[in-house]
């Protein structure tokens, strides 16, 4: 979080958030965190000359996730403003929720081929970071078979999609990245319709041409949907009115873009920014610089999703690359 003078007495602020970067010590890595293991000379030099501190961004009674933490970092007390992850993503996609709607994250995931759905193991919560183009076709196939007056499906980015449940309820659902490598039976929704749709989705997706082609290329199939992150319609205060600053958001993921929409911040679209390890880092940085120097923005929030993605997959060597 840095403030920089840019002439004429104006001060501009930029904040860089490496989502999930610190993480917890890992026994297999000698008790070090991924951030301790990473080759990050520029960050190390900045730390030597910077004011350092600890921020508690996640209240103990709320789920530890990107939604709660990023709201906190932007100055929105999650005890007041948090209504679930998916409703924020709905804002980004452009879905106008009713007060009686419940939003659900609808991942496309990779599960094993065991005959009984409840005996299947969740292999990959991101289906190999499937492309948005492939995933949109799969979500459309699911929509044609499962959508009705009560449930509507909307495509998002990569493996992250949205389901709106008309007159639904906020049910307890397990994030798929929390149960990687485990049999899914005990983690399925208790709500029967949600569970039944997940089961049916496997039959719809497993032999879909998109997945057959992915399998031939040695890629994980996106052969099931997975519901989680339920929540109600959000209501965020205007960022300018709250902080006195015009804000710009640089992020590839719908969660952060949705926060920006709700807070009336400006979303900056960056070509090649995909929320993965090989995102366009330079493009994101330059978009923030341009916003501060050439546009009417006083604050830029640069969100980097790659650490969170890699750590969710428990690849210790991968997040140390950047």
Please name every model-derived segment.
Residues 232-313:
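Anion-binding catalytic surfaces of enzymes that hydrolyze or transfer phosphate/sulfate esters
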